[in-house]
Amino acid sequence: ESPWQGGYLSGIIGKWHRGSHPVNHPLNRGFNEFYGHLGGGHRYFPELLTDRDIFEPMSDYESYFTYIVRDHQTVETDQYLTDEFSDEAVDFLKRNQDKPFFLFLSYNAPHLPLEATEEYLSRFNHIEDPKRRTYAAMVSAVDDGVGELLATLDELGIEDDTIIFFLSDNGGVSKKNASNNKPLRGQKGDIWEGGFRVPMAARWPSAFKAGIVYDLPVISLDIFATIAGLNNAPANQGRPLDGVNLVPFVNGEDTGVPHEAIYLRKYDQQRYAIRYHDYKLVIPKLNAKPQLYELSEDIGETNNIANAHPEKLEQLDKMLKEWTSELQDPAFLGLTHSDAWIKKRNKQK
């Protein structure tokens, strides 16, 4: 909501996954435009879409078959989903080139189900595994789309005034779609490094030198803090941000670390972790004994050193418990409201 309050026209294209209740609709959460789907995944070919009621599905999988939505109205589509979102994003840039804008382009690809057009599949005939081949094709479609966006910004002459962040939302699902997170341990949904540690790229010719590689850990919450910092948005002392403005760190003006500690929680499965500098404490499941790893020497998290460093284990465990004590239970998980939210609502009636 902050960019909207700062005079920006804001739009989201693609996957929303912030709840399907009308109160959680993007247009009720600060966005001016929405084109996409409410659930966490979707079918890629328009002939597979059968449900016009976007609020009827009660599970993420059921929502995969809903029609695409423009603002509040379902629309007929005739393109491969990734190409559809790319074209919409290019159109958004052209329509709003003369005004401040914020665009959240949330590609569904390469999320399951594995579906790609022959145009993209034909680029990877050398890959024998059909899952891996389709996965590569889906990523290639995203690559083409991002290339179109960058070219459009250049053609419109607004590339120097536009900051771009590109990242994934989680690690690959190696057991289902042949993605590969090696040398990291784990996959999507895990609190091992393979579950959440992903690359992030940024482009802003006015400030970032091309080719810079920044190795210290950052988090997706830094994106909001960076945008707020660039807009000189006043800080809300009652609601401090978890993220930081990355510009001085990336440009070398600040030689410290953006985050001394990074905290992780998989609420619905009671998985927790904290990374403090190069040490990482992991609680892989409810009531499990904490494990300790030294990531600079063991990026694959294979050697549990908890018994050898009890003082470090105790320090990180205390920090993690203090952090979790400040958290609220999530209001919804995926498409629908969580049990905790429903119980709280019923008590208030």
Model-derived features: where do they sit?
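Formylglycine-dependent sulfatase
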Residues: E1-Q291, L295-S325, D329-K349
